């Protein structure tokens, strides 16, 4: 398994898995502006592959995608020891499945259209929570 690590402690790696190119571009540009290192995947299959390869700090995941949908991606992320602790923000146009998404293992649920600022605030909160948990577990910050 190869794994890409952060370029610097202040540059979290975010993987956006969404079949809509405009969505990937808009949120990707905003997160890059906020000093994130952003990778994208246009479907669930390539998203799963990148999640294992990159070991990102956070994943932004759409639910309705071709090849492998977001539900299947989330299930695999939560079942794999490589990806189980990566925070996942579900960002979807589907407004009626919030409870199911949390039950499936997402850490946050946002509906499209979502202002990029809201995604950023949720990203910061989840990354802060994750680092706090790692430090309390004696594993220290991830580098």
Regions from the language model: what does each represent?
Residues 89-91:
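Hydrophobic/aromatic residues positioned on beta-strands within the core alpha/beta folds
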